[in-house]
Design a protein with these regions (language model features):
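Sec-dependent bacterial lipoprotein signal peptides
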Residues: 1-19
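Membrane-proximal, proline-rich intrinsically disordered regions
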Residues: 21-66, 300, 485-513, 523
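Conserved, well-structured interaction surfaces
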Residues: 78-148, 175, 179-183, 192-204, ...
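Short coil/linker segments at helix-helix boundaries
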Residues: 146-187, 231-236, 240
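Aromatic- and glycine-enriched pocket-lining scaffold segments that form the walls
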Residues: 199, 203-230, 236-239, 243
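Hydrophobic-face positions in mid-chain alpha helices that act as interaction patches
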Residues: 235-380, 415-450, 460-462, 470-471, ...
Length: 523
């Protein structure tokens, strides 16, 4: 029986060159685990990136404003992320940490696949192979979403990609070809399709922390939503995979937002319930090294750049066809009621979805490692993926889109008035586009794909509005900004709580994060 050596530190050494050769050799004896076909599944515990996109994506998006400088940033990283600056910070939640953790996860996948291949790919190892392939696709997808432009069939063959690693590395400090975005998406698709049906849910002790079949199908639905083809065939794939997740009655599998909203706003009661592994709405939960639970949450931290009252008027305090926000919790249209600090100049208005978990490092010094649990895929988000696909397929599918939006509305809001194509077209058609003097939830769209007419655009505005509110604090708004070429601003709030200066960020080329400096030597 063949045995293989995986080194927990070697992936970082390959990719970043952060350690010298002598440091690497010094660590070699203490960081090795023998892998065999019998225990190879254990390495897949390391196949999920341990850095979430939440902070970097939320800080970069229009969900965040800058407050007066008498408030402090949580750290230099938070300031860099808000200002879209090329950050040299390497701590948790940074682009560098995401890059590193994704490639470490990919290295674990490749090690597992090598063991399976050299064992002759027996059927008994199909679940390992399936999970490894889907995890490899997911880690590359996360990297592409942050470090590349949004996919466009017109430019993807020349747009810069990220290195797609398929092999176990055998050399230190190799040079990688970043290739094109087209290459990346084709490889993601190949891995995802090859792996998803090999997955077996019954091999997991805690399935929600692994790619189950439904989680893989939800990933496929989101992937194909982003992978827009000239003939729109990708939307058929979104619908096909979303159907596998949602079944014949989507309203039976989405989250019970009313029950969640009834929980205490104080403490971690609601955030813990949101990421409860027993909740059928949660398809994949990922534990991450992060301080996002401090930065965005009900603490006097990170208030210089925050989701405050003005931003909330476009999100969790926004009005819609479904009704109006009210400061009276029982009368507010949304079941999930926001927490707000009560200072003279409130800086934080948040939905209680992200708890900060603490791992004590030094009790005497009081130092900790921070962690969060991220609901990476949920039935609710998959529902809105399908609704968007129906909208983009055109008028013959608008009623299916409306049906999905009504499922969302019934679950997330108190509204009992069904949405219709006509009502949405009128409501968003009459709404002016966002301007700084008069902000609205309707912002100009400049996607690489074609929006057919006013009605389709207004349905998209409704869909984007719903997703922005529902996924607040989770980073998905930034991906919508990139995909739809949405013009956003860096707004500076004065001590009176009103808009002061602003910077417009309208160039789609800006909607990428620079790769970590350690990887700029990639070809």
């Amino acid at each position: 029986m063949k045995k293989y050596i995986i080194l927990a530190s070697i992936a970082t050494a390959f990719i970043f060159g952060l350690s010298s050769c002598s440091d690497f050799l010094d660590e070699l004896p203490d960081n090795r685990t023998e892998l065999t076909p019998d225990n190879v599944s254990k390495i897949l515990l390391a196949a999920y990136p341990t850095t979430a996109i939440c902070e970097m994506a939320e800080m970069a998006s229009d969900n965040t404003d800058a407050y007066p400088n008498n408030f402090s940033a949580f750290n230099r990283l938070q300031e860099d992320l808000y200002k879209w600056e090329d950050s040299s910070e390497r701590e948790d939640d940074s682009p560098s940490a995401l890059w590193e953790s994704c490639y470490i996860a990919i290295a674990a996948c490749n090690q597992a696949l090598k063991v399976v291949e050299d064992a002759g790919s027996p059927a008994s190892l199909d679940p390992v192979k399936g999970e490894a392939l889907v995890c490899r696709a997911y880690a590359h997808f996360q990297l592409a979403n942050i470090f590349c432009k949004a996919y466009s069939s017109a430019t993807a063959k020349t747009d810069l990609g990220i290195p797609y690693m398929k092999d176990v590395e055998t050399t230190v400090l190799p040079s990688y070809d970043r290739g094109t975005l087209e290459d990346v998406y084709k490889n993601i698709e190949a891995d995802l399709l090859a792996g998803m049906d090999l997955i077996r849910d019954d091999v997991y002790s805690v399935p929600k922390y692994h790619f189950t079949r439904k989680a893989a199908y939800a990933f496929a639905a989101r992937f194909y939503l982003y992978y827009v083809q000239p003939d729109l065939s990708n939307y058929d794939e979104v619908i096909r995979f979303a159907d596998r997740v949602l079944g014949n009655n989507a309203s039976a599998v989405v989250r019970d937002w009313e029950s969640l909203g009834a929980l205490d706003l104080n403490g971690d009661v609601a955030p813990n319930a949101y990421v409860d592994a027993s909740n059928s709405a949660n398809l994949l939960l990922v534990s991450a090294h992060s301080y996002w639970g401090y930065v965005h949450a009900p603490y006097g931290l990170g208030e210089r750049y925050a989701h405050g009252p003005l931003a909330a008027m476009e999100t969790c305090r926004s009005s819609g066809l479904w009704g109006d926000y009210s400061s009276n919790k029982a009368a507010s249209v949304y079941y999930l009621y926001p927490w707000s600090n009560s200072s003279a100049l409130p800086t934080k208005v948040i939905l209680q979805k992200v708890a900060q978990y603490k791992e004590m490092v030094d009790p005497v010094a009081g130092t900790i490692n921070g962690h969060i649990i991220n609901a990476a895929f949920t039935t609710d988000e998959t529902l809105l993926c399908r609704a968007e696909a129906y909208i983009m397929k055109g008028p013959g599918f608008y009623q299916q889109a409306i049906a999905d939006l009504n499922v969302w509305q019934s679950a997330f809001t108190r509204s009992t008035t069904p949405l219709t194509v006509e009502a949405i077209d009128t409501y968003y058609g009459n709404m002016p586009y966002y301007t700084l003097p008069a902000p609205t939830v309707k912002k100009e769209l400049h996607p690489a794909f074609t929006i057919a007419d006013r009605t389709q655009e207004n349905l998209i505005h409704c869909l984007l509005h719903a997703r922005r509110v529902m996924t607040l604090h989770e980073g998905l708004r930034w991906l919508d900004i990139k995909r739809f070429g949405i013009v956003i601003y860096r707004r500076y709030i004065t001590s009176s709580g009103m808009f002061g200066a602003s910077d417009v960020l309208a160039t789609c080329l800006l909607y990428t994060s620079p790769s970590p400096r350690d990887m700029r030597r990639s070809r």
